[in-house]
A protein has these predicted regions:
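Membrane translocator/pore-forming domains, dominated by Gram-negative outer-membrane beta-barrels
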Residues: 1-218
Length: 218
């Protein structure tokens, strides 16, 4: 599995921002199970592409004694956020080791999110200099709603020519998420981040997801 993302960010000195993301990835799958007789194992492997885009907007409200307008300065903050994202998982055609032909359709996801981040920034410099480096730790939470649900049709053709199809997906609905993250602005143009979060809601539970990475601005 490998993927890439392109980011574009607009930021205002007073705390407003907008993030734009495009992504594409290749996802390899390996399947193993028993055929309809329950006697022979059936195996298959295939690859498929995925494409996505998202827009996120928000505003950071700073509060603390002696709070500074500069968003990197030492302070507590709360940041409401809104996001809309779309992802297309392309279908695939493949044949299992027992000769079963599978035609897997595309799956579409449209997800809306409303959330917040509550945290504390610790700046490197003082109020008298322009050092924009900082370290941040924060709690996050909110609600997500899946509008399309990833509905997908999968058709099967057996070695005897018999056909069948099933409808998969049904993950639309509302779920809640919560977690913690850390940000370290190493330089003006480079930032490291780590996040752990969990989701649960309608017919869906996602155990703790941990991500670590970096962002280079240019």
């Amino acid at each position: 599995e490998y993927s890439g993302k392109l980011y574009a960010t607009w930021m205002h000195d007073k705390g407003s921002y907008a993030d734009f993301v495009l992504q594409a990835g290749r996802y390899e799958q390996e399947l193993e199970g028993f055929d309809n007789t329950g006697m022979d194992k059936s195996k298959a492997d295939y690859g498929t592409w995925g494409f996505g885009a998202s827009v996120e907007v928000g505003h950071m409200f700073s509060f603390d004694s002696g709070v500074d307008d500069r968003r990197w300065f030492n302070h507590w903050f709360v940041e409401p956020q809104l996001q809309l994202s779309y992802f297309l998982a392309k279908g695939a055609d493949y044949t299992t080791s027992t000769g079963l032909k599978v035609d897997q359709g595309n799956a579409d996801f449209l997800t809306g999110r409303a959330g917040f981040v509550l945290g504390k920034k610790f700046n490197y410099g003082t109020s008298d200099d322009l050092d924009r480096r900082y370290f941040q730790v924060a709690l996050l939470g909110g609600v997500k709603h899946e509008f399309l649900g990833g509905d997908q049709t999968i058709s099967y053709t057996g070695v005897d020519g018999a056909k069948a199809s099933v409808h998969a997906g049904d993950i639309d609905g509302t779920r809640f998420y919560y977690g913690v993250n850390c940000d370290w602005q190493v330089t003006d143009n480079f930032r490291l981040y780590a996040q752990a979060s969990r989701e649960e809601g309608d017919r869906y539970t996602k155990d703790y997801d941990i991500s670590i990475g970096g962002k280079l601005l240019f």
